[in-house]
């Protein structure tokens, strides 16, 4: 096993990551970094975090053998890490609990968040209600339309939802607005970023709170199959569910890590969100990474049937894993993801989020060419209730 200790002291993963923000945010980031570096080694903080994961979220989440599907495909065995069974229905809550506990220790009574699919917004609103905090969630107006049920859920939980009408009206625009709010209300506000992007310490902090996913798998897989899997597959938008399951496996060189980006309507159409496949190195939301850009270096509008993958950048650690060759990245189109969504419902009785359906589609694509003793572990990062309207619309139905 190779040791792995990135990022460095300045928050860099090789040439990626770092801190590229306005001077007005430097004090807040320094304060956050100091608080996090203290809490991450504080046994009482770790105990409280683990207690909440067990009793509030319902962890550990199980690993599950998709046996009927594996048998039907006739190749490798597909296993799911069932993050869809968490309280709030996705992996997002792991990170939100960690950051909310940190906010409480820092004496910040107000939390803000950006959200795409709405899952991070729901998870933030949920933990804000749990700890009695004020909560404001920024969401692109296009995503508000796509994810109406999650918007209502956030409001039920006591959050204020602010629709953002600028740019493509999606996740990147919501992130911009959240940053503006944070600058304005820095004294009493904690910004809970939902993915492994943003300026240091966010990429490593979000990753650390999400690694519970992979840590559990390291224990669970030997219990059920006697060893670790051959492949670990996860969807990548910003990349937090993928980093959560990848990171503990990085030292295990015989385990191949495969991230799955949104190829949208097809890579050749330009209507996709595959930053690692088609982006160039640039700076977005405070860190250096692969960014979807046009010929003038402006951030390009992205497309995916899945709101949570519809982001023009990617976490800097994924950029590093790609360049170093430790992880590979593939693209799955809208149509392939929708087919996997329907098959998963009918064959396994599990309705995955459209984000997770991209990872499942990649596993299904790989399986027939592999021998039956090979094992693919897929991070089923969330459940698909939130995507009912999108899926029905694509099938020409009105709910």
Curated annotation (Swiss-Prot):
The modification N6-(pyridoxal phosphate)lysine is found at residue 92. The keyword RNA-binding does not apply. Its cofactor is pyridoxal 5'-phosphate. It catalyses: (1S,2R)-1-C-(indol-3-yl)glycerol 3-phosphate + L-serine = D-glyceraldehyde 3-phosphate + L-tryptophan + H2O. It comes from the Bacteria. This is Tryptophan synthase beta chain. PANTHER family: TRYPTOPHAN SYNTHASE, TRYPTOPHAN SYNTHASE-RELATED. Its EC number is 4.2.1.20.
